[in-house]
Swiss-Prot record:
This is UDP-glycosyltransferase 100. Keywords: Glycosyltransferase, Hydrolase, Isoprene biosynthesis, Transferase. Induction: Induced by A.niger mycelium-derived elicitor, thus improving ginsenosides production in adventitious roots culture. Pathway: Secondary metabolite biosynthesis; terpenoid biosynthesis. Component of the dammarane-type triterpene saponins (e.g. PPT-type ginsenosides or panaxosides) biosynthetic pathway. Glycosyltransferase that catalyzes the biosynthesis of ginsenoside Rh1 from protopanaxatriol (PPT) and the conversion of ginsenoside F1 to ginsenoside Rg1. It comes from Panax ginseng. Pfam families: UDPGT. Transmembrane segments: none annotated. Changing C82H: Loss of glycosylase activity toward protopanaxatriol (PPT). UDP-alpha-D-glucose binds at A344, Q346, H361, W364, N365, S366, E369, E385, Q386. The gene is UGT100.
Length: 472
């Protein structure tokens, strides 16, 4: 009888791609396993449609894609970002139940588990109806996962109001970090006094019901954090199986990518600094101008992915920038050394020999991609857990330099502006430390470790084998 796993990813590009690529990995490693991925359409991230189409255009044997019915976006416009996904899965429960009912009644298939994104763990109620074991996928790193469990314990078991850490100079002793974590690096969502933190912390409480947590990381990158999670008897078994990446670039605009990569082909090796801040990584106009001035003054070649601002309540991400946001004459003055783009094929850019440094928002996927390609990073976090990721990269792991590590720009509401002089200085530091700098050496070493981890008998390879023993 065929064994089947059901995957339920959050419909945000980084979350979805990670789970689909993981499904492909599972299938490639176990010949008796099939995976069905249930995809919800999310009205903001237009990149999901392109990725979804690419999956359907190039089917993978034993991988089934089921698109769940689209839900009216008006239901979500006024919800804070953290509440969108738990609300979304609540509205999809009926459809998920129908799929699970059909699959569990099949005489040719044995459903061996439901693997849900950490933001979708409320779907466990449906899995329980069919006695299907549940597992969690964490698209964030082990360090953040440990912090979330720590805050959930403080909030629920020790009755400590974690929102009091906002604007505090407290340093927290978090089990998943070797260094004390200043409160300024805690994700904003945990600190909101409007009840948002309760929504998120309740998800981590439910995670404890799972039979295992699969994390997109690897032992050599986060040994301290992974060990701390394994030492906690109240946390399910941890399976680090990464780095899981979209190495083939499915869902990318090939025409735009060709133009961008063609420009890079004309640049000298390791000469270009690449700036990219993720799907929601946009800046107010005054900050855009400071970045432009800092780049121009640095004298370095650059490739800058610039996105228009998205406001709370908007329903679509825009992929193109407006020239009006840039200083007068900037594009003309820098035309020989720089290129400003909207959407960026990030993996292909980081893999290109012309790129010598990466200014990043420190989303976890971007962290893993930079490690995979041995690319030194300058941190500029924006939202979510990115401040904590930046802290981990700079302070814990020594794999990055900082432009800012505690910058916050939720829905472009930040009043803080990073000045051109600081941007210029940090870009020069990132690009001019040379091939023998300490950070470059460490990043190159971690690149090799990341590839060994995924190879036969590597740490992630072995961890996945242990997961199969549990599931099958």
């Amino acid at each position: 009888m065929k064994s089947e796993l059901i995957f339920l990813p959050v419909p945000a590009f980084g979350h979805l791609v990670g789970m689909v690529e993981m499904a492909k990995l599972f299938i490639s490693r176990h010949e008796n396993l099939s995976v069905t991925v249930l995809i919800s359409k999310f009205f903001i991230d237009t990149g999901i449609d392109n990725y979804n189409k690419s999956l359907l255009a190039k089917p993978t044997p034993r991988l089934t894609i089921i698109n769940l019915p689209e839900i009216d976006p008006q239901k979500y416009l006024l919800k804070p970002r953290c509440a969108i996904f738990p609300s979304l899965i609540e509205n999809q429960k009926t459809h998920v139940r129908d799929v699970m009912s059909r699959m569990t009644q099949s005489e040719s298939t044995r459903v061996v588990g439901l693997l849900a994104d950490i933001l979708f763990v409320d779907i466990f109620d449906i899995a329980d109806e069919f006695n299907v074991p549940t597992y969690v996928y964490s698209p964030a790193g082990a360090g953040f996962l440990g912090l979330a469990f720590h805050l959930q314990t403080l909030n629920d078991d020790k009755k400590q109001d974690v929102t009091e850490f906002r604007n505090s100079d407290t340093e927290l002793l978090v089990p998943s970090f070797a260094n004390p974590v200043p409160a300024e690096f805690l994700p904003s969502i945990f600190l909101e006094k409007d009840g948002r933190h309760d929504v998120l912390l309740s998800l981590y409480w439910r995670c404890r019901e799972a039979k295992g947590i699969i994390v997109n990381t690897f032992e050599e990158l986060e040994p301290y954090a992974i060990n701390s999670l394994r030492m906690d008897s109240m946390i399910p078994p941890i399976y680090p199986v990464g780095p899981i990446l979209n190495l083939n670039g499915e869902g990318q605009n090939s025409d735009e990518a060709a133009v961008i990569l063609g420009w890079l082909d004309d640049q000298p090796p390791s000469s270009v600094v690449f700036l990219c801040f993720g799907s929601f990584g946009s800046f107010p106009e005054n900050q855009v101008k400071e970045i432009a001035m800092g780049l121009e003054r640095s004298g370095h070649r650059f490739l800058w992915s610039l996105r228009p601002c998205i406001s709370e309540g908007e329903t679509t991400l825009q992929l193109k920038y407006s020239n009006l946001e840039l200083p007068a004459g900037f594009l003309d003055r820098t035309s020989c050394v720089g290129k400003v783009i909207g959407w960026a094929p990030q993996m292909a850019i980081l893999a290109h020999e012309a790129v010598g440094g990466f200014v990043s928002h420190c989303g976890w996927n971007s962290v893993l991609e930079s490690v995979w390609y041995g690319m030194p990073v300058a941190t500029w976090p924006m939202y979510g857990e990115q401040q904590l990721n930046a802290f981990e990269m700079v302070k814990e792991l020594g794999l990055a330099v900082e432009i800012e590590v505690d910058y916050r720009n939720e829905y472009n509401k930040s009043d803080f502006i990073v000045k051109a002089d600081e941007i210029e200085t940090k870009i020069k530091k990132l690009m001019m430390d040379g091939k023998n700098s300490k950070i470059r050496k460490k990043v190159k070493e971690m690149k090799e470790k990341s590839r060994v981890a995924m190879s036969e008998n590597g740490s992630s390879y072995t961890s996945l084998a242990k997961l199969f023993e549990e599931i099958m």
